[in-house]
Amino acid sequence: IADAGQSIILIGDLPNELGGSYFLQTEFGKKEGTCPGVNLAEEKKVQDFLIKTIDSGHINAAHDISEGGLLVAITEMLFENPELGADLSIDSLGESNRLDALLFGESQGRVLLSVSNENLDKVLESAINDGLPVMKLGTSTDSGRLKLSVAGNEILDSEVNKLHKIWSESIPEKMNHS
């Protein structure tokens, strides 16, 4: 994300699974569980949408939601410029009704986008026309803080620099204990 005032959009559904996730492995030492399902037709729709929308110049940044899930993806998008932050809100926990699955689930076919307000309606309309689930999560800010509320409850309000430090130190820490 390059600037404050960008809309942050989720393409794809809210996750309903945690099996095989990095979260389960690092937090609970579990390397098992039913891995997220793969729907190749749905994945192709997402990839075709991304190619078309990037080619049109309507997307400023994109990040897949894979290892670590939604929360890791959004923080990684903010690391390039620690003066930026984001103010995000998700209306519900989704199908799983679990906060951990929402934040750390690694379901396939999901991407975060940063889009200018000028292109927001075009991107939303294009996703809907392509049959993709899409929701605006919030906007980038110049606060240097990541704020996230879920179902009306604030669950995170932290400095991006602090999140980056935790993220960067966790990799060597986990490697020393694997």
Model-identified regions with their sequence ranges:
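Glycine-/charge-enriched secondary-structure boundary and capping motifs
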Residues: 32-33, 47, 53-178
